[in-house]
Amino acid sequence: MQSEYAGTPRLRCRRRRLSHGEARPGSARTRPLDRPEGVWTEPDLHLFPQDGHRYEIVDGSLFVAPPAPRWHDDLVGAVVTTLRAAAPPGWWVCDRLGVAINQGVSAGSNLVPDVTVLRPRSSGATWSDPADVALVVEIETPATRRYDRMLKPTLYAEGGIRAYWRVERGPVSPTLSVYELGPGGFRLRERAEGAEPIKLDTPYPVRIMPSAWA
């Protein structure tokens, strides 16, 4: 699932994916941004400069996150490596693959999780359908703490995504919080940190040792 353009995630995930607005080496945009007259929509994400910020749309409103620190990208890579090593044939583990949530209360939302796991025989849409998504993972930073703890899990739950992981950096070892979808939204199932491994069965059997991500 290789992305050829920062604003259009595609169904290939063999190498690191550019986030919305993340610059390719040597690239630049100089034309002014044309603001929409109404709500923001997915095509508007193509208008932004590739300056390292992450641009997402929530219910037609624009949300912008500052460029992530290097340790964040290192953690994303470590989580992807763990999930790919355990993935059964046919599953896709993607970093920064867009998800379009266009149902329920959250109609008109385009989100970019740090890590996305897609089920076999996924639709292949430019923006993934939540029905194809088995797991989303967010790596929390100081700038995205409230966003990753409150708003984005609510939207993922409204889209029907069954599993959500949140990873915090921690002073010694990352901490993994594992959530599963219940009747009222996501509920905490397990929390792990340090060198004590845990075994999870969602999205597929996988052994996690958070200290290995440090």
PLM features: what roles do these ranges have?
Residues M1-A214:
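Gly/Pro/Ser/Thr-rich low-complexity, intrinsically disordered segments predominantly at protein N-termini
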